[in-house]
Amino acid sequence: MNDQTPDRYVTFMGIACDTNADRLCEMLAARMAGNDSRWVAYFEKKLAENAQMGHDRLRFIGAQVNALMSFFEEEDDEAALALLWHIEHHCL
């Protein structure tokens, strides 16, 4: 590549994958709080399993992309969907 665009197949430098994963998980937690969606119990279980296995948030997002997309679509959360798309296409 001759341009300055970060290439995830070469390095994750300059992409801020961990920071973006943290932001998305914060957005998820905020949406889950006080929510009666069927997704809340699902994500609570998956987040607990992820923590128990010692996996990071980026690993969690990679494993849950489709479920996260469905939940954020259900919640009409365009910002979370945009960030999820960015993570999926630049970090996973």
From Swiss-Prot:
**GO biological-process terms attached to the record:** nitrogen fixation
- Keyword Manganese: yes or no? no
One of the Pfam families matching this protein, by short name? CowN
InterPro entries assigned to the protein according to its UniProt record, in alphabetical order: CowN
Entry keywords, A to Z: Nitrogen fixation
Keyword Signal included in the entry's annotation: no
**NCBIfam families attached here?**
N2Fix_CO_CowN
The Swiss-Prot or TrEMBL record describes its family as follows: Belongs to the CowN family.
State what this protein does: Is required to sustain N(2)-dependent growth in the presence of low levels of carbon monoxide (CO). Probably acts by protecting the N(2) fixation ability of the nitrogenase complex, which is inactivated in the presence of CO.
Q: Write down what this protein is called.
A: N(2)-fixation sustaining protein CowN
